Protein backbone atom coordinates (compact mmCIF):
# COMPACT_ATOMS: atom_id res chain seq x y z
CA UNK A 1 0.00 0.00 0.00
CA UNK A 2 2.08 2.90 -1.29
CA UNK A 3 -0.74 5.29 -0.40
CA UNK A 4 0.56 5.45 3.19
CA UNK A 5 3.87 6.93 2.03
CA UNK A 6 2.09 9.25 -0.39
CA UNK A 7 -0.22 10.46 2.39
CA UNK A 8 2.75 11.06 4.69
CA UNK A 9 4.43 13.14 1.97
CA UNK A 10 1.26 15.15 1.34
CA UNK A 11 0.96 15.92 5.04
CA UNK A 12 4.64 16.91 5.25
CA UNK A 13 4.26 19.30 2.29
CA UNK A 14 1.08 20.89 3.66
CA UNK A 15 2.54 21.18 7.18
CA UNK A 16 5.64 22.88 5.80
CA UNK A 17 3.55 25.37 3.84
CA UNK A 18 1.30 26.05 6.86
CA UNK A 19 4.32 27.20 8.89
CA UNK A 20 2.87 26.08 12.22
CA UNK A 21 -0.64 27.41 11.64
CA UNK A 22 -3.37 24.77 12.12
CA UNK A 23 -4.83 23.45 8.87
CA UNK A 24 -8.61 23.10 8.60
CA UNK A 25 -8.99 21.53 5.15
CA UNK A 26 -6.90 19.98 2.39
CA UNK A 27 -8.17 19.43 -1.15
CA UNK A 28 -6.43 16.95 -3.44
CA UNK A 29 -6.89 16.13 -7.11
CA UNK A 30 -6.28 12.47 -7.87
CA UNK A 31 -6.51 11.12 -11.39
CA UNK A 32 -8.31 7.84 -11.98
CA UNK A 33 -5.31 6.60 -13.98
CA UNK A 34 -2.74 7.54 -11.33
CA UNK A 35 -2.68 4.10 -9.64
CA UNK A 36 -3.46 5.88 -6.36
CA UNK A 37 -6.55 4.71 -4.53
CA UNK A 38 -8.46 7.70 -3.17
CA UNK A 39 -10.14 5.54 -0.51
CA UNK A 40 -6.74 4.45 0.80
CA UNK A 41 -5.58 8.07 1.00
CA UNK A 42 -8.76 8.89 2.96
CA UNK A 43 -8.11 5.95 5.29
CA UNK A 44 -4.50 7.00 5.97
CA UNK A 45 -5.14 10.74 6.27
CA UNK A 46 -6.56 10.99 9.81
CA UNK A 47 -4.00 8.58 11.21
CA UNK A 48 -1.07 10.36 9.58
CA UNK A 49 -2.33 13.79 10.70
CA UNK A 50 -2.17 12.95 14.39
CA UNK A 51 0.28 15.17 16.23
CA UNK A 52 0.69 17.60 13.31
CA UNK A 53 -0.84 20.96 12.40
CA UNK A 54 -3.24 18.96 10.22
CA UNK A 55 -4.80 17.07 13.13
CA UNK A 56 -8.57 17.43 12.80
CA UNK A 57 -8.37 18.73 9.22
CA UNK A 58 -10.88 17.53 6.67
CA UNK A 59 -9.78 15.96 3.42
CA UNK A 60 -11.55 16.59 0.14
CA UNK A 61 -10.61 14.55 -2.91
CA UNK A 62 -11.57 15.53 -6.42
CA UNK A 63 -11.26 12.54 -8.73
CA UNK A 64 -10.11 13.47 -12.23
CA UNK A 65 -11.48 11.32 -15.05
CA UNK A 66 -9.09 9.65 -17.46
CA UNK A 67 -8.90 10.99 -21.01
CA UNK A 68 -6.77 10.01 -23.95
CA UNK A 69 -6.07 11.33 -27.43
CA UNK A 70 -5.53 9.09 -30.43
CA UNK A 71 -2.14 9.72 -32.01
CA UNK A 72 -3.46 8.55 -35.38
CA UNK A 73 -6.73 10.45 -35.84
CA UNK A 74 -6.77 12.99 -32.98
CA UNK A 75 -10.00 11.71 -31.39
CA UNK A 76 -10.29 12.31 -27.63
CA UNK A 77 -11.78 9.45 -25.64
CA UNK A 78 -12.60 8.56 -22.04
CA UNK A 79 -10.12 6.15 -20.47
CA UNK A 80 -10.86 3.96 -17.48
CA UNK A 81 -7.45 2.28 -17.55
CA UNK A 82 -4.09 3.48 -18.87
CA UNK A 83 -4.64 1.85 -22.26
CA UNK A 84 -7.48 1.45 -24.70
CA UNK A 85 -8.66 1.62 -28.27
CA UNK A 86 -9.74 4.67 -30.22
CA UNK A 87 -13.50 4.81 -30.70
CA UNK A 88 -13.11 6.34 -34.15
CA UNK A 89 -10.26 4.47 -35.89
CA UNK A 90 -9.50 1.50 -33.62
CA UNK A 91 -5.88 2.50 -33.01
CA UNK A 92 -4.17 1.59 -29.76
CA UNK A 93 -1.77 4.54 -30.11
CA UNK A 94 -3.25 6.68 -27.34
CA UNK A 95 -1.68 9.51 -25.41
CA UNK A 96 -2.99 10.02 -21.88
CA UNK A 97 -3.94 13.68 -21.57
CA UNK A 98 -5.79 13.62 -18.24
CA UNK A 99 -6.17 11.35 -15.26
CA UNK A 100 -2.63 10.81 -13.95
CA UNK A 101 -2.72 13.80 -11.62
CA UNK A 102 -1.86 13.93 -7.96
CA UNK A 103 -2.06 17.54 -6.84
CA UNK A 104 -2.50 19.39 -3.61
CA UNK A 105 -5.10 21.76 -5.01
CA UNK A 106 -5.59 23.89 -1.91
CA UNK A 107 -5.38 24.06 1.83
CA UNK A 108 -7.33 26.14 4.29
CA UNK A 109 -5.66 27.32 7.46
CA UNK A 110 -7.15 28.81 10.60
CA UNK A 111 -7.23 32.57 10.82
CA UNK A 112 -4.98 34.06 13.41
CA UNK A 113 -6.31 37.22 14.99
CA UNK A 114 -3.67 39.48 16.43
UniProtKB/Swiss-Prot annotation:
Keyword Transmembrane included in the entry's annotation: no
Example of a GO biological process term: protein modification process
Cited InterPro entries: Hydgase_Ni_incorp_HypA/HybF_CS, HypA/HybF
A molecular-function term among this protein's GO annotations: nickel cation binding
Binding site for Ni(2+): 2
Domain of life where this protein originates: Bacteria
List of residues binding Zn(2+): 70, 73, 86, 89
Annotated keywords: Metal-binding, Nickel, Zinc
Entries under Pfam families matching the protein: HypA (PF01155)
Function field: Involved in the maturation of [NiFe] hydrogenases. Required for nickel insertion into the metal center of the hydrogenase.
PANTHER family according to UniProt: HYDROGENASE MATURATION FACTOR HYPA
Family the UniProt entry places it in: Belongs to the HypA/HybF family.
Record-linked HAMAP family: HypA_HybF
Protein name: Hydrogenase maturation factor HypA
Source organism: Rippkaea orientalis (strain PCC 8801 / RF-1)
Gene transcribed to yield this protein: hypA
Amino acid sequence: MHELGITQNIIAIVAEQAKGIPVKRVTLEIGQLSAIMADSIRFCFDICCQGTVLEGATLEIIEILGRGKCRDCGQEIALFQPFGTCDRCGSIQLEIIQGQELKIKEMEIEEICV
